[in-house]
Design a protein with these regions (language model features):
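Extracytoplasmic/peripheral linker and loop segments enriched in polar/acidic and small residues
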Residues: 210, 214-224, 233-280, 290, ...
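Detector for C-terminal structural segments
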Residues: 78-79, 346, 350-351, 355, ...
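Append "and occasionally in soluble cytosolic enzymes with long acidic Gly/Pro-rich linkers
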Residues: 406, 414-416, 508-641, 732, ...
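N-terminal lobe/hinge region of extracytoplasmic solute-binding protein
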Residues: 58-128
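Extracellular/periplasmic solute-recognition and catalytic clefts
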Residues: 406-419, 432-500, 531, 535
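Gly/Pro-rich hinge or "lid" segments in bacterial periplasmic/extracellular proteins
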Residues: 89-95, 290-332, 338-341, 345-350, ...
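Aromatic- and charge-enriched surface segment that lines or borders ligand/interaction sites
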Residues: 119-305, 444, 506-516
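C-terminal motif of bacterial Sec signal peptides marking the signal peptidase cleavage site
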Residues: 21-24
């Protein structure tokens, strides 16, 4: 069960989640901030009645890294974004607000909302292809300890995240900011340099031969432990009759024989072809290293728990920075233009980069050393390569957000309203972020343990909610429920390299073959998804989350259901058809595609002959753990039965996650079902660009779409700043994806926020919640009764 880029993707997701959380700063229900600083005056009149209001929010176990730079879990991030301020705001669609200081109005779902932020951004695309992000910060931001914030606090934070020793989730260091790569790479960790140089390196400029020899000996010793950990994990988790049979053994035989355990571990992890008689854990590690040629990537991707380097007894000897050339004291493209302004100069335009411009406003005087900050002399609040002082404040956070971090004790984070917050002191005095189990969230709100939660949505959860309300509805006298579309969606994919005619994935015949399958599969979506999810999900028609600003809408010209025309472009369905008639019509339309692919049919409507080079059989992999419990399982089985009536065999293989994942990552799955979480920007590069197909790049284009026109549109879309233009470009790109017949959008499920109707003033929860505009988006106006 390869981890396969999961850690890299998780880091990107965490970073983006933090950006969007920091961007959620206010809306039209919040009046524009006054021009005067919100810091309290020296003399104030005591309120007539002390505000003692408290709200308890249910959350999962914290990683206890409450630092804007080093948080590691989404639950820590929820806390961090409550006391931290970000430079830019975002709207309900996840788009960046350019004019947050004065306020910017954006329509959503028929309502105009005005958004305020801590700063503005002006994007200037230069004639030479470079781009300037001119950032302006409000001049009245105050940290919760009373210290005014300036642009130097922002610059300090940028240099923390660009430091060669930085190991948090931000990827600012990867942006094409002028001089960034030179600054970041001017010092590198010795173990990374040794790993990159390889075993046969003969250049000993930065280390001696003895160091290199000792390093690789230590790697081999750790590698054997690394492989053994995988073996032990596989045996502990998958030694069942079903999986043991994959190596023609029984669970008892595997449990009793270490050699069989190695074979089983290699096979289940996708290394069955590398196994030889008598193979050991050391041989297994050698196979892993050979497969990657990069021990760092191998460690990140193949881990069963521990990093390779965690298992090196002498890793500390190599976990140190080494100067790789002349010192680079600053980043040329980070330009201070005033006490409250900054320009970021990038060598090229990337539409996704603007999300990184909502830099943390991090108090230099708290996380850094003011005596070590002098912008003009290339001093940025700490010694380059040493973030120990910043990390030391991980459990003592400070910021300029709506709340002040007070403590973490016994699984509870206590936060108090920040009177200096730029949108005004929050109405709820105290918020407790309380650890708990997801299954206990809704019952806990009913009993008074919690006031608000975001539980995983399931039939059991919805039943618990409706049972608690006297009206039997999701919102009633006990609980108030808000359903929001999930950021990702479920889909069915086809590997074009494996499902084609005569080895030509891009031919019209190959596209027709795949569209024949998709036409039959698509028609069963409404019935099956409604049966499986009910109100918890809806069928979608395009390969993009409905939450994206680039998603086609039903009112758009040319909008149509996925795979709803035949091979001649004629509509398959009409409004008078019932479900059975639609199924029959879809099957007949599929035949037109199969005929275009080269199939012939006899008088009884069954396949008479298949085209040369067509696969002999077809298979869909579904990770239902052998229990048929997957939202797309019913679609696949219904389509399989329908196709069987015309003589085409489509097998539905319900497998464990490891088998499914190995097939997907090894690009051996003809067809598969999956779901993913999308980002705020609809950039398609990672999933659909040919540079990531055929095992190249990130190996994330599992469809193996290799289309120059699609590649050009993807690049065009990510290099334009015009949102409407990008939307039209992505609409064309989605058309090509659908024409290749490699993806069937299936469903978009929903998330939910549940609050106590009794204790929370639910009228103060945000209106028109979205994945990018949740319950915390207007936390300063959220009130309890």
């Amino acid at each position: 069960m390869k981890m396969s880029n999961i850690k890299k993707i998780l880091a990107l997701v965490l970073a983006l989640v933090m950006v969007l959380a920091l961007c959620a700063c206010g809306n039209s229900s919040t009046p524009a901030p006054s021009e005067e600083t919100q810091a309290p005056a020296e003399e104030t009149q005591a309120p007539a009645e002390e505000n003692t209001s408290t709200l308890v929010y249910a959350t999962a176990t914290f990683g206890q890294k409450f630092s804007p730079f080093f948080y590691t879990t989404a639950y820590d991030e929820e806390v961090v974004s409550s006391f931290t301020g970000g430079l830019l705001a975002a709207d309900r669609g996840g788009a960046i607000i350019h004019h947050g200081i004065e306020g910017e109005t954006v329509e959503y779902n028929g309502t105009d909302y005005t958004y305020y932020g801590m700063g503005d951004v002006e994007v200037v695309q230069n004639d030479d292809g470079s781009v300037d992000y001119n950032l302006t910060m409000r001049d009245d931001i105050v940290f919760s300890d009373g210290t005014p914030a300036t642009i130097d606090d922002v610059i300090f934070g940028i240099y923390v995240m660009a430091d060669p020793s930085y190991d948090g989730s931000s990827t600012v260091y990867a942006l094409p900011i002028e001089g960034m790569a030179d600054y970041y790479n001017s010092q590198q960790y010795l173990y990374k340099l040794l790993a990159e140089a390889g075993r046969d390196n003969t250049d000993f400029t930065l280390w001696d031969e003895a160091t290199q020899t000792a390093f690789w000996a230590s790697v081999d010793a750790a590698g054997e432990k690394f492989a053994q950990e995988i073996i032990d994990s596989v045996v502990a988790s998958y030694n069942t009759d079903e999986y043991a049979a994959t190596i023609e053994a029984t669970p008892d035989e595997i449990a009793a024989d270490p050699a069989l355990q190695v074979k089983f571990g290699m096979n289940m992890w996708g290394y069955g072809d590398a196994w030889t008689e008598g193979a050991t854990a050391a041989d297994y590690w050698a196979a892993i290293e050979a497969a990657y040629g990069d021990i760092i990537e191998a460690s990140d991707t193949e881990t069963a728990g521990s990093s390779l380097f965690d298992l090196m007894d002498d890793f500390a000897d190599y976990d140190k920075l080494v100067a790789t050339g002349d010192d680079v004291p600053s980043i040329k493209g980070i330009i201070r233009t005033g006490d409250y302004s900054l320009t970021v100069h990038m060598t090229e335009y990337d539409a996704t980069a603007i999300y990184n411009m909502s830099f943390i406003i991090a108090p230099l005087h708290h996380y850094g050393d003011v005596s070590k900050y002098d912008y003009d002399n290339n001093k940025f609040g700490f010694d380059k390569g040493d973030l120990s002082g910043v990390k030391a404040k991980t459990t003592e956070p400070l910021g300029c957000g709506p709340y002040i971090f007070k403590s973490y004790e016994n699984g509870v984070v206590t936060m108090e309203a920040n009177p200096t917050y730029f949108l005004g002191e929050p109405k709820t005095k105290t918020i407790l972020f309380k650890e708990g189990e997801d299954a206990d969230y809704v019952p806990g709100i009913v009993t008074g343990t919690y006031d608000l939660a975001v539980p995983s949505i399931s039939e059991e959860t919805l039943n618990a909610i409706t049972d608690a309300n006297s009206n039997g509805e999701l919102t009633g006298d006990t609980l108030t429920t808000i359903l929001v579309d999930y950021r990702g969606y479920g889909y069915l994919g086809i590997n074009a390299d494996l499902v084609n005619i005569d080895g030509d994935p891009g031919s019209e015949e190959s596209k027709a073959l795949r569209k024949g399958f998709m036409t039959v599969l698509a028609v069963y979506r409404d019935t099956v998804i409604n049966s499986y999810y009910g109100d918890r999900a809806a069928v979608i028609q395009y390969p993009i989350s409905n939450t994206s600003w680039a998603a086609p809408q039903p009112a758009d010209e040319g909008y149509r259901a996925a795979y709803s025309v035949d091979a001649d472009g004629n509509d398959i369905f009409d409004s008078s058809m019932n479900d059975e008639q639609k199924y029959d019509a879809a099957l007949k339309a599929a035949v037109t595609f199969f005929e275009k692919a080269g199939y012939t049919f006899d008088a009884d409507g069954k396949v008479a002959s298949a085209p040369a080079g067509a696969p002999e059989s077809y298979e869909i992999l579904i990770p239902g753990q052998g229990k048929q419990d997957h939202p797309t399982y019913g679609i696949a089985t219904a389509a399989s039965k329908a196709l069987e009536t015309i003589g085409i065999k489509l097998s539905v293989n319900d497998v464990g996650t490891s088998v499914w994942n190995n097939a997907l990552e090894g690009n051996t799955a003809q067809m598969w079902v999956a779901a993913w979480q999308s980002t705020a920007d609809p950039d398609m590069y990672q999933v659909y660009h040919s540079s990531n197909a055929h095992g190249k790049g990130t190996n994330s284009n599992h469809y193996q779409v290799d289309d120059p026109a699609l590649d050009a549109l993807i690049i065009d879309g990510r290099t334009s700043a015009d949102t409407e233009y990008r939307k039209s470009v992505y609409k064309q790109a989605m058309g090509i994806i659908m024409d290749w017949g490699v993806e069937l959008p299936v469903y978009q499920r929903k998330d939910c926020t549940v609050a106590s109707t009794i204790r929370v003033d639910c009228d103060t929860l945000p209106k028109d919640m979205t994945p990018y505009w949740g319950w915390k988006a207007e936390i300063e106006t959220l009130a309890v009764k």
